[in-house]
Amino acid sequence: MGWWRETIDIVKENDPAARNSLEVLLTYPGVKALAAHRLSHFLWKHGFKLLARMHSQFWRFWTQIEIHPGAQIDSGVFIDHGSGLVIGETAIVEKGVLLYHGVTLGGTGKDSGKRHPTVRKGALISAHAQVIGPIEIGEKAKVGAGAVVVSDVPSDVTVVGIPARIVRVHGEKDEPTIHEVEEKRKYYLDKLEHAREASHHSSSL
């Protein structure tokens, strides 16, 4: 009962509308989707890939939440509402992450191997945010509603917009610090893009 208890408790901690454990267990689609994913992921890891996909697609129909059975999701994750949420095959979601409806943890279609995001402990991804590619969302970072994130987000910052930009660091609107962090982020993003372009060029020769 450890996983169930932890999952129900995190819902009650984060959703004031959750009145009791039975209500959470019976009526919250995020809880059902995460529970189903545990079996899908087990089947996937043990080589029953078609069965895993069929199982995950069945629960996609019932919950409107699509989680690829290959995705790695820790315990203590909260999916609120959940409708339209998509988590790709190589995504990693750590403990204490909050995901809202319409979120996509997706791929660019250009990467191979690790193609989807890693979301570190305690991060929050708001409704309809699109987090794309093999990037990392740092611990306790917050991604605003409708943001499009295509590069790493440092720990304990808030990003908003298209493309996402940093607006708060450690909960404060400290302009010099925000500017410094953004400059570093852009520098490393440019280096990463150049490395990817060089890799694609060499592979096409």
Task: Name each model feature, range by range.
Residues R60-V167:
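Structural signal for interior beta-strand "rungs" in well-ordered beta-sheet cores
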Residues A123, K173-D174:
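Intrinsic disorder/low-complexity segments
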Residues M1-T63, D174-L205:
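Terminal amphipathic alpha-helical/low-complexity segments used for targeting or macromolecular assembly
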